[in-house]
Regions:
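Catalytic-core environment of secreted peptidases
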Residues: 60-116
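A non-catalytic alpha/beta surface segment that caps or lines the substrate-entry region
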Residues: 19-66
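Alpha-helical metal-binding/catalytic segments enriched in His/Glu/Asp
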Residues: 71, 100-152, 215-221, 231-252, ...
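Short beta-strand segments
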Residues: 72-74, 144-146, 195-199, 220-222, ...
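Acidic/histidine-rich catalytic neighborhood of metal-dependent amide-processing enzymes
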Residues: 111-212, 260, 271-272, 283, ...
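N-terminal capping segment at the start of a domain
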Residues: 1-24, 320, 377-381
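Metal-dependent amide/peptide-bond hydrolase catalytic core
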Residues: 173, 238-407
Length: 407
């Protein structure tokens, strides 16, 4: 692994503006770099569904020994991301364990840095390039770079179920009788390709063992309009119904793995009119299906009871944004990650996340997907930074993961 090169590559990517729906320049840069490493590069047709100016990037590199491994990160960033000026500086860093001086990459302060997720892409590229340059044995390698991840995982959701199947016209060390979908060639249907999503906080060696189901609530409450000063008795306030429902809903942290929130209420037309309609939006999450469905039912019941009691009606709609992904300590993929971390001297930390990532969607499409911490800190803010050693260690980790699957 070339520590200077991974930093240079990251700084180059940071300078490319790539907000959601406008990832084409970043995708073109990545396609060129992957082609230089020997990958066959293609883009899917997801842009028609996502509205992005490019599709998801899918690249394959034939291996020298049987087996297959895949890595994923996302091309898009949140805003503000126009004219990012990356700064490398030394600062005092304190965490739960130590206080130390560390070299970091941060933005000049007016924008995000975009370590989320360009640090993930840079680490994947450097890890793979190091394997290729060293002539080390390697399994077949797939790289997936998604669009619109920051927009409720639109890019990965639009990925066809068979999009990562190894191309029939491309040689593969693991060529065999593969099942359809995201399975590695030569794998039995019960053996989907291990896919590592580099897109979480936490130092390299952090393994996201679980990420929740995510359901979104949209409700429309109907009351009856009336003049608020002349005949309020004739009206039924839709906003009052919404308030009564929210007041009785279990919200916040429900248990150690379940949360719920109402984040948007809108209704009414004027202060002197009893509001005839109101719209409400919320969500619930849990690692476990029975608990998230119970929470969903409780929120629905609160809305229906309030509407009935106060003389209105309500229409409730729930949408599953993505399913949960849960790994156990004894899973093979976790064992391989722990062995790879040990090989490059990284401490392992098992973490459960309250948010989703592309791994949630890709697991539902048949991959054995798991999210890894890459060291990004304060992401989605102008205070975002990443320690240079974390960027370099993540590239080493990618290299070690590839070696682990070449055994």
């Amino acid at each position: 692994m070339n520590p200077d090169r991974v930093l240079e590559s990251f700084l180059e990517m940071v300078a490319i503006e790539s907000p959601s729906w406008h990832e084409a320049p970043m995708a073109a840069c990545c396609a060129e770099k992957l082609a230089e490493m020997g990958f066959t590069v293609a883009f899917d047709a997801s842009a028609a569904e996502t509205g992005s100016d490019t599709g998801n990037l899918i690249a394959h590199l034939p291996g020298t020994v049987p087996g297959r491994v895949a890595f994923s990160a996302h091309l898009d960033t949140v805003k503000p991301c126009a004219g990012i000026e990356a700064v490398v500086e030394t600062r005092h860093i304190c965490d739960d364990v130590t206080c130390r001086m560390a070299e970091v990459v941060c933005s000049a302060g007016d924008t995000i840095l975009s370590a989320d997720d360009k640090a993930g892409i840079a680490a994947i590229f450097e890890g793979v390039r190091s394997v290729v340059e060293s002539d080390a044995v390697r399994p077949d390698i797939t790289v997936l770079l998604t669009t619109c991840e920051e927009q409720s995982l639109l890019g990965s959701s639009a990925l066809a179920d068979d999009a990562l199947a190894w191309p029939a016209d491309l040689p593969a060390a693991s060529r065999g009788t593969a099942a359809e979908g995201l399975l590695g060639d030569g794998a039995a249907p019960s053996e989907p390709v291990p896919l590592f999503v580099l897109d979480a906080d936490g130092a390299p060696g952090t393994i996201i063992m679980g990420a929740p189901y995510h359901w979104t609530l949209r409700a429309r409450i109907e009351g009856r309009a009336a003049h608020a000063g002349v005949e309020p008795e004739e009206g039924v306030s839709a906003i009052q119904i919404a308030a009564a429902a929210v007041a009785t809903m279990p919200l916040g942290r429900i248990d150690e793995c379940t949360t719920a929130n109402v984040g948007h209420i809108e209704g009414g037309v004027a202060v002197n009119i009893v509001p005839a309609a109101c719209e409400l939006e919320g969500e619930c999450r849990s690692l476990y299906e029975d608990r998230v469905l119970a929470q969903r039912d409780a929120m629905t019941a609160a809305l229906e009871e309030a509407a009935e009691r106060l003389g209105g009606t309500v229409e409730v709609a729930w949408e599953l944004d993505y399913p949960a992904v849960v790994h156990e300590a004894g899973d093979a993929i976790v064992g391989h990650l722990e062995a790879a971390a040990a090989a490059c001297g990284l401490p392992v930390c098992h973490v459960v996340s309250g948010g989703g990532a592309d791994a949630n969607v890709l697991s539902a499409k048949g991959a054995d997907a798991i999210t890894l911490g890459i060291g990004m800190t304060n992401f989605h803010s102008t205070d975002e930074y990443i320690e240079v050693t974390d960027l370099q260690n993540m590239a080493r980790y990618v290299e070690a993961i590839i070696a682990e699957y070449a055994c």
